[in-house]
Structure formats: structure tokens, C-alpha cells
């Protein structure tokens, strides 16, 4: 669990989500000590984010769940609200930034669970493959303000992380 300012990346994301949602569930490969929230283990070990999504959707008490990666500490309530408003009768609402879908900062209906589990049982365990089988509303970045767009700064590489540490969480 990498630290950023006074918290780990996961703690930053959890804190942001707790300000928006009454229930926060952390999907993990293995249980994490020190996380005082409900944790669910991946339904199928080694199957990436799709396994975590399945476990989380199986646990939520609501018809929809917002899913966010733990390496996205800048996630904003503005982004969540914008995506939430686009749900309507879709199965998923996924933002598109720079021409690329962002399936790890998206809303998913629990009605997706069967399709996700079928994918986990098959060869293609990618979220993008699952999205092709769902009724998805894609939300283009054109309607997003700066705070919402900043949500998509993730810390995938050591260089991303080093820049965030150097600049402080709210300076990146």
C-alpha cells in the first residue's frame, strides 16, 4: 500500500468514496489488514479487475455500484455525479477520456453480474470485452469539468507515483 501525503492510495480513494456513498466495499485479491470496511475477495483468483467487479457487485445492497481503481486517488464527486445522471436504462455508464473508455471509474448495474460471471468462465476476462456485451452509456469528456477530468490521473507507473509524491496530492 503505497503512501501519498499522509495516507495510502487506497485510503485516499476510500475517503473520497465515503464522502459520496453510504456503503463502500473494497474488492481485494487477499484480505488487507488495517482496512476497516467490508472486503470481498476476487471471485476467481488471477482474473484481474473483472473478478473484483463480480465480487463487489455480488455484495452490494443497491441496484447500482460505482467502481473505481485504487490507483486513482483524485476521483471527484463531480465525476461520480455526472456519470450517475446518465444511468437511465443502461447496464453500465463508462466515461471516455482521450478516446479511451475508463471502465475502472464507472457505474455498473447488478444486472451485469451474469454476463461478468460468464466472461470469467470463458477465455476473455477483460472488462472491455464484457462492455461489448452490455448496454453501455459512454460519457464523453467534453461534458466534464477540470475536477472531473483530474479524476482520471492514475498512478500506474513508478514515475506517476514519484510525481504525485513530489507534488503532493492536490498539486498534481
Language-model segments: which ranges?
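Nucleotide and nucleotide-moiety/phosphate-recognizing core
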Residues: 1-127, 132-150, 162-171
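Dinucleotide-binding Rossmann-like beta1-alpha1 core, especially the glycine-rich loop
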Residues: 153
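Conserved active-site and cofactor/substrate-binding residues in soluble primary-metabolism enzymes
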Residues: 159
Amino acid at each position: 500500500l503505497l503512501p501519498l501525503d499522509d495516507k495510502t492510495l487506497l485510503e485516499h480513494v476510500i475517503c473520497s468514496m465515503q464522502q459520496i456513498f453510504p456503503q463502500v466495499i473494497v474488492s481485494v485479491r487477499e484480505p488487507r489488514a488495517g482496512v476497516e470496511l467490508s472486503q470481498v475477495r476476487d471471485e476467481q483468483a488471477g482474473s484481474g479487475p473483472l473478478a473484483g467487479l463480480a465480487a463487489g457487485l455480488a455484495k452490494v445492497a443497491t441496484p447500482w455500484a460505482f467502481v473505481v481503481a485504487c490507483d486513482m486517488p483524485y476521483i471527484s464527486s463531480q465525476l461520480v455525479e455526472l456519470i450517475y445522471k446518465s444511468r437511465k436504462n443502461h447496464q453500465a455508464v463508462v466515461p471516455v477520456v482521450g478516446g479511451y473508455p475508463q471502465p475502472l471509474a464507472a457505474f455498473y448495474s447488478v444486472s451485469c453480474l451474469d454476463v461478468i460471471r460468464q466472461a470469467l468462465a470463458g477465455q476473455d476476462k477483460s472488462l472491455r470485452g464484457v462492455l461489448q456485451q452490455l448496454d453501455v452509456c459512454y460519457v464523453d469528456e467534453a461534458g466534464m469539468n477540470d475536477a472531473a477530468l483530474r479524476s482520471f490521473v492514475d498512478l500506474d507507473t513508478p514515475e506517476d507515483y514519484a510525481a504525485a509524491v513530489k507534488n503532493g496530492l492536490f498539486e498534481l
